[in-house]
């Protein structure tokens, strides 16, 4: 049993948030039901709502509330249900407040430094966690939270350079293979959280993500001092994952050589499959947005090479021609569909065998 804020995990496994629409209430609830932490992505959670094109904010908040309630119903009190909220999104604070009102157990936040997160969550029992890629980032965030809000993190997630989606490393370092490894970053972050554990009188569990694939990987990092791990790509090929089967099939058929580092309109590099869209972008083709959902703080529709909302929605539907398929570095190892329970059991069994 691992305590995170006022709640507890029976299994130290987090399911990483995946948007648009890949991790919603179905997947998050199934992971929580197994004793882990299921995570709903707030990114355009309402993309299937009839009024999404006309009023994306209302559609997203309505859907987010429904997905959290769905996950909680599936979990039946086991594990924890969290959201992943990206700092770079326009409705960042509003989405978090909606989730808190809906009864979410935790907020995990990255794609930027979540410096204001404690103030947004307020004086609630909701656990909060930053996603970091270095000890320096962890120190900066926790120092700000302590000084401005008199609060610290309930846990921390390290996302390494092998993660899927948006990455907290420079594009040059990613392409050159010069990024710090999780083996390098974990001791740094563990050292940086120690003073805050002493100051606030409770432990701050640290989870590692990005390239974690097996229970043996989990055993390796817990032996180094991590409380547990976060996985995302492996959960895509579960029956409970909220994406279409077409989306899952694209990842199941992916080879290691299909993975690319791309530039996202979010302003960060990302890891995705080399689909026709990615190939066209690499050749300099621009796909002007047909409609702006106002999803990102920094996006200029007049200049952006493509609309990431449109590309991710097409992906989750299984449209391989027009979709952007984010994935982790180990996507080529995916070889079958399974249930969330089967995956969780496999990971925990391997973890215990390798301790």
Regions found by a protein language model. Give the residues of each.
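Active-site entrance/lid segments in N-terminal catalytic domains of soluble metabolic enzymes
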Residues: 1-199
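Conserved active-site-proximal phosphate/metal-binding subdomains
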Residues: 14, 163-182, 186-207, 213-355
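Residue-level detector of alpha-helix initiation sites
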Residues: 22, 212-213
